[in-house]
Structure formats: C-alpha cells, structure tokens
Amino acid sequence: MFRKLILLAIVIFIANSFYSRDHGGTTKAASSAPSSKHSTGSVSAPVVAPPRWRYVNPTDAISGKSYRLAQVKSVNSLALDYPYRGANFGTLSVRQHPQFGLDVIVSVEKGQILCPGDDYWTCVFMIRFDEGEPERFTAKKAADGSSTVVFAAYPKWALQKLRAAKKITVQLLMYQSGNQVLTFEVEEPLDW
C-alpha cells in the first residue's frame, strides 16, 4: 500500500510540473530566482530549427505493402470562429499509395474547407510557390465527405512544384471564416 501511495505522489508531482510549464505557471525554483534591477529588458529568442519535410513509410493494412508519405506542418494557424477557435494548423502531404496512387493533400486540424463553384466535388483555391505568382490550385473533396481535407486534382503538377519550393502558401475558403491562408516553409524542397 505504501508503495502505491509513493507512486501516486510521484505521478501527481510529474503531472503538476508538466501542467505548470504548459499553462504559464512557474516552478518554485524559477519563481525564486533573483531579479536584476539593471535588466535591459531584452530576452534572446531560442534558436528554432527550420521546418523539414517528415518522411515515413507506413504499411497499408489491406495490401500489406509499404507506401511513401511526406508531410510538413504549417508555420501558422488558421483564425477561425467558434466552434473551431484555437490553434488550428494545416498539413501538406505527399503520398504514393499502392491502392490510391499519387496524392498531394492539404488538410486542417478542424473546420470546414468549402469548395466554391458549380461542381460540388471540385474546389479551386490559390497557391503560391516561393515568391512566384499566385496560381489556381484545383482540388477534389475527400471521397468520404470529410471537410478537413482536399486532394490535388493534378498531383503530378503539384509534385513538380513542391520539388523546387521552400515556401508554399495556400489560400482556402473556410466555412463562416472566409479565405484563410496557410504557409508551409521548409529548409529544403521536397525530396521525392
């Protein structure tokens, strides 16, 4: 019984220290640090590594074959209204799948991507590669009706552009929030 109480106390202590750090709290050691009256007021920013494409080779559950997947998360969050308020990053994915073939996919964590136009399944957005001119980006809705993801209608065209770009900017029409922009920046272009 005593061991269980000790273990519970350790778990609570660890959980509390993570909660304090993640929610702006300070630990006792940090709050009791001496302050300097002669501080310049400047704080050096931490060095952040540039984003990179993340490459994985998952296995398809049906065929048992592995496939290629590359993903990068947006450097900015969408500014959506209730009920989608809060941090909401996008993901740009390239997938070569044994069942579905080549796909270039744009997805958001929450919200509803709208597809303006006459064709319910076809979406036309604007996309910009590096400092080039904005171009029309034709996409298709997900077959399952998901509103958080769209697939490039011309994935080979998009793949060719991604192989050369370090900055990709996509403008999406979001339900009750208008046009929203996601920016994807990478240290190196897609290696595909």
Predicted regions located by residue number:
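A generic "folded-domain core" signal
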Residues: 19-192
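Alpha-helical transmembrane anchor segments and their immediate juxtamembrane flanks
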Residues: 1-26
